[in-house]
């Protein structure tokens, strides 16, 4: 591997954690230096570890690492005083990529109201339409739809679709970004839900069936454009906060319950996005992954499913993701459909 910047070195160290964890407590990498925390003061051990990691780049005196193509060095410092840091499990792609399991060891609290998240690797494959179709089917199955409403959330912070479909939003509405700000600034779930419930506007998302039209609760991405372009809080910043790793699904669930809704439907941001990760990587959330038959869409969906499957203990009640394969040409061979199915299911083989 070639190391063009300090960030390449940091990623490489995280990728090869198993190769140095027995001799070193930690390695911290910065733009101009790398700090090594040896478990022993025997220089030969720590030098051997670094030479094994960077055989072509470490200098003969073991005091720096040469960056490829720049002629610059990254100085190595050795620190023998080390205070252990508690490792946190974060439902974010940038953390999950280096972990054997993306799920916490402790049992998470059950959600009071089910949360369904709709995701796609690529845009334009029918993710939002799948959510609407799901909402229509849900409404159609209820004996009394007016008493079985949904809380539908547009959480796409880069290309909000449902929000734009709704047209002009009045300033008295309440948005997903408003909710994220409340969560960022407060750790008390009950207070967050109470405030959000009081601020919820009158905006609804109408779902029509063959029998009736039901106005479901709707949380748009934003209520004025400046919210969208001048972000303060996001799912990523909230998740990185102390003791808020899995708060998002809990707040959405409890907010739905407080409104009298029976379930939450969330339209996620497409792609490998940290805006979507906290719900995609929460084992309590039911995921629907939407893909077309294109190779790019299928391979991207497989990448997402591989993240979801990392360390997932499959039990009878495990919420495995469901894949919606759409936009299938009439002439698409059955054999190729089967190959796509086997390719995606392979992510969860034990």
Residue map of PLM features:
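Walker A/P-loop phosphate-binding motif and the immediately C-terminal alpha-helix
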Residues: 108-164
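Extended hydrophobic secondary-structure segments that form protein cores and membrane-embedded regions
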Residues: 116-118, 150-155, 218-220, 266-267, ...
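Conserved catalytic-core segment of NTP-binding enzymes
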Residues: 5, 44, 48-52, 246-349
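P-loop/Walker-type NTP enzyme "switch/lid" segment
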Residues: 155-257
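A short helix-to-beta-strand connector/capping loop
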Residues: 61, 205-218, 260, 316-319, ...
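Phosphate/oxyanion-binding active-site loops and adjacent basic polyanion-contact surfaces
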Residues: 89, 94, 126-127, 240-248, ...
């Amino acid at each position: 591997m070639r190391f063009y910047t300090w960030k390449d070195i940091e990623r490489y160290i995280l990728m090869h954690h198993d190769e140095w964890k027995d001799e070193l407590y930690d390695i911290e990498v910065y733009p101009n230096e790398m700090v090594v925390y040896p478990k022993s003061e025997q220089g030969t051990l720590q030098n051997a570890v670094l030479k094994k990691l960077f055989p072509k780049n470490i200098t003969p005196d073991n005091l720096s690492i040469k960056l490829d193509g720049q002629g610059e060095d990254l100085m190595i410092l050795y620190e023998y005083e080390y205070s252990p840091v508690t490792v946190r499990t974060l439902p974010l792609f940038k953390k999950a990529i280096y972990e054997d399991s993306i799920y916490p060891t402790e049992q998470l609290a059950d959600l009071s109201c089910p949360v369904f998240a709709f995701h796609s690797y690529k845009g334009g494959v029918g993710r939002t339409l799948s959510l609407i179709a799901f909402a229509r089917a849900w409404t159609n199955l209820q004996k009394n739809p007016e008493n079985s409403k949904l809380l539908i959330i547009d959480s796409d912070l880069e290309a909000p679709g449902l929000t734009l479909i709704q047209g002009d939003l009045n300033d008295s509405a309440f948005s997903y970004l408003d909710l994220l700000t409340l969560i960022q600034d407060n750790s008390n779930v009950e207070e967050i839900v109470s405030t959000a419930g009081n601020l919820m506007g009158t905006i609804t998302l109408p779902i029509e069936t063959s029998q009736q039209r039901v106005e479901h609760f709707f949380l748009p991405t934003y209520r004025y454009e400046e919210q969208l372009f001048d972000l303060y809080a996001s799912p990523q910043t909230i998740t990185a906060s102390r003791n808020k790793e899995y708060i998002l699904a809990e707040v959405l669930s409890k907010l739905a319950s407080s409104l009298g809704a029976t379930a939450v439907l969330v339209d996620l941001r497409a792609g490998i996005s940290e805006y979507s990760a906290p719900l995609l990587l929460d084992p309590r959330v039911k995921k629907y992954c939407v893909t077309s038959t294109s190779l790019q869409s299928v391979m991207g969906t497989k990448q997402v499913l591989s993240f979801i499957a990392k360390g997932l203990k499959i039990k009878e009640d495990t919420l495995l993701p469901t894949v919606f394969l759409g936009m299938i040409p009439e002439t698409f061979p059955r054999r190729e459909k089967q190959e796509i199915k086997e390719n995606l299911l392979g992510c969860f083989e034990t």
